[in-house]
A protein has these predicted regions:
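Alpha4 helix (beta4-alpha4-beta5 surface) of REC/receiver domains from two-component response regulators
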Residues: 96-113, 117
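Short amphipathic alpha-helix used as the core "switch/output" element in two-component signaling
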Residues: 74-85
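Active-site residues of response regulator receiver
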Residues: 65-66
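Acidic catalytic/metal-coordinating carboxylates
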Residues: 44, 72-75
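Conserved acidic carboxylate
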Residues: 17
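Acidic, metal-coordinating helix/loop segments flanking the phosphotransfer/catalytic sites
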Residues: 41-61
């Protein structure tokens, strides 16, 4: 609980990332720097779609890599288009070309970050998403 007696819940997150090394480093960093709790990990587009379906309104943040073992992160962004207003979808990629950023944003990504140079901005966005999720009623679509 915070000083006002409000329960501070971590940001329930679905992580779509096929690299074990990146996951091993990213998960503890997200927990420490942005109060993120990873509730599901997906290495493929089909695993991510199952996680989105399983958790429905109960996730707050989807962190999506674009190039997966099988399938594309763009598929996940399409599936997130009807997400609730409290839910955020961000792309964390090694290929943040201007064209790829444009495509991701057109598909409804809230933001696109370069894994190699924009992690500080990514963590700031996670903190902002956590604040918004706590203040946004669940069950309303974007």
């Amino acid at each position: 609980m915070d000083a006002k007696g409000v329960w501070e819940m971590p940001l329930s997150t679905i992580l779509v990332e096929d690299s074990p090394t990146i996951r091993e480093n990213l998960i503890p960093a997200m927990a420490e720097l942005a109060d993120v709790q990873v509730i599901a990990i997906a290495e493929t587009a089909s695993e991510a779609l199952l996680a989105l379906e399983k958790y429905g309104e109960d996730w707050d943040l989807a962190v999506v890599d674009l190039f997966l073992k099988s399938g594309s992160g763009l598929t996940i962004l399409r599936a997130c288009q009807t997400r609730g207003s409290h839910q955020h979808a961000v792309v964390l990629t090694n290929y943040p070309t201007s064209e790829m950023r444009r495509r991701c944003l057109e598909l409804g990504a809230d933001a696109v970050f370069d894994k190699s140079s924009e992690l500080d901005a990514f963590f700031e966005h996670c903190n902002s998403a956590r604040t918004q999720a706590r203040n946004q009623p669940r069950g309303t679509e974007r």
